[in-house]
């Protein structure tokens, strides 16, 4: 580990400075002294100081050369000339060509999926492509189908947002008015039938929303996906590509997946194999769990720059309308006539509060009744069960909004848990 109290790094054209921060409470300050540089597609402002904290894995790239001043404790810090950024900008140029044609003919802009195994930089490539699109005046939609490590909403959900300005260097994209659908599991394998149903619904609504604004219509959609690419995971990728009508699929770092997609998607879909960045870091299960936990914590409490102050309040069992999507499997012989085993996977069933509910995250659905299309209805937000009192027949909820819950509030169970030890 190196302790760096301040050093200038001179980068040649088409190179990048990479650093990682793993120590808790460590922070690194970066400023652009001269030249031009960007972080995942967002331009750095000259002389402005940017702060990065624990968990940051940063790659600052320059097309023309620059000088960066860096200070603070880093676990790794080096300059690399081996970077795939030129290939990534070529992908942006190809998408921009599609957008110009779509604009002329009043058609939908390109729908591009980014796919690949875990830890190859899928969400980073999405961020780069979205930033480049916004910088040339586009307003693309960003759809995140990664229920394990989602970057828009918390894990266990899929979501879409409109991108109107480049991502903040330190905090990423503004998550204003996201369209969020509840899934309730950390992997599509938790309920494959439900996952496909939720993806189909979000694709339908997202494609319809393109018609609401001419600029967004021609700007298209960038889609991030899960890192599960074999067996059923691969089937989910094919399902998503069909549901969204993808015209381009960018495959990161896996020739096998690239060749399978070439074989299985329609010939008019452009499938492109891209290298991953050498700066991509493989994450352990523990790190993935920590990242999920951090996303939930930030949902309720914000961060140091923009803290939130959530509310805790009690709800009686009798006022709690709590449901789960997916009933336990039944043998075919026990199924009602005309009902298939898959139907059970999307059945909405009531949940009786027990002590096992503690720490579980619940989604607040916009659906008002189980008679509504609960799966196809987006969610307003999330709360967390911090206490279950069987004697008093009540639960304590942690919520971004004060009491009471909205009238006819319908809460959906999730396997995600959050230990609220915030002080």
Swiss-Prot record:
One of its GO terms (cellular component) is tRNA-intron endonuclease complex. The keyword ATP-binding applies. One of its GO terms (molecular function) is ATP binding. The keyword Nucleus applies. Its main location: nucleus. Keywords: ATP-binding, mRNA processing, Nucleotide-binding, Nucleus. InterPro entries: Clp1, Clp1/Grc3, Clp1_C, Clp1_C_sf, Clp1_N, Clp1_N_sf, CLP1_P, P-loop_NTPase. GO terms for biological process: mRNA 3'-end processing; tRNA splicing, via endonucleolytic cleavage and ligation. ATP binds at residues 16, 57, 119-124. It is found in: Nucleus. Required for endonucleolytic cleavage during polyadenylation-dependent pre-mRNA 3'-end formation. HAMAP family: Clp1 (MF_03035). Belongs to the Clp1 family. Clp1 subfamily. This is Protein CLP1 homolog.
């Amino acid at each position: 580990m190196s302790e760096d109290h301040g050093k200038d790094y001179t980068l040649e054209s088409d190179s990048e400075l990479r650093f990682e921060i793993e120590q808790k409470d460590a922070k690194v300050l970066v400023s652009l002294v001269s030249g031009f540089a960007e972080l995942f597609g967002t331009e750095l402002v000259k002389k402005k100081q940017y702060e990065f904290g624990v968990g940051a894995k940063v790659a600052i790239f320059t097309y023309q050369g620059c000088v960066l001043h860096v200070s603070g404790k880093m676990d790794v810090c080096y300059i690399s000339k081996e970077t795939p950024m030129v290939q990534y900008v070529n992908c942006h140029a190809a998408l921009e060509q599609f957008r110009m044609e779509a604009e002329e003919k009043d058609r939908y802009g390109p729908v591009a999926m980014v796919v690949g195994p875990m830890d190859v930089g899928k969400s980073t490539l999405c961020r780069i492509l979205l930033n480049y699109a916004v910088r040339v005046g586009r307003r693309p939609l960003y759809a995140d189908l990664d229920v394990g490590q989602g970057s828009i909403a918390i894990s266990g959900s899929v979501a879409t947002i409109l991108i109107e300005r480049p991502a903040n260097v330190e905090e990423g994209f503004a998550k204003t008015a996201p369209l969020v659908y509840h899934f309730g599991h950390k992997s599509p394998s938790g309920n494959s039938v439900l996952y496909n149903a939720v993806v189909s619904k979000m694709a339908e609504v997202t494609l319809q929303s393109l018609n609401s604004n001419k600029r967004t219509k021609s700007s298209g959609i960038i889609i991030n996906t899960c890192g599960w690419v074999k067996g059923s995971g691969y089937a989910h990728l094919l399902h998503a590509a069909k549901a969204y009508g993808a015209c381009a699929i960018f495959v990161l770092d896996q020739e096998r997946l690239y060749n399978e997609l070439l074989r299985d998607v329609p010939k008019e879909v452009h499938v492109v194999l891209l290298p991953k960045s050498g700066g991509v870091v493989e994450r352990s299960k523990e790190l993935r769990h920590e990242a999920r936990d951090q996303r939930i914590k930030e949902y309720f409490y914000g961060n140091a720059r923009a803290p939130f102050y959530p509310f805790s309040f009690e709800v009686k069992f009798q006022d709690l309308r709590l449901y789960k999507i997916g009933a336990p499997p039944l043998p075919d012989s026990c199924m009602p006539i005309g009902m298939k085993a898959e139907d059970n996977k999307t059945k909405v069933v009531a949940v009786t509060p027990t002590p096992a509910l503690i720490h579980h995250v619940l989604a607040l659905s916009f659906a008002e009744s189980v008679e509504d299309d609960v799966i196809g209805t987006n969610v307003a937000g999330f709360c967390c069960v911090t206490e279950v009192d069987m004697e008093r027949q009540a639960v304590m909820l942690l919520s971004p909004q004060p009491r009471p819950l909205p009238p006819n509030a319908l809460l959906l169970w999730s396997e995600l848990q959050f230990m609220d030890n915030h002080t």
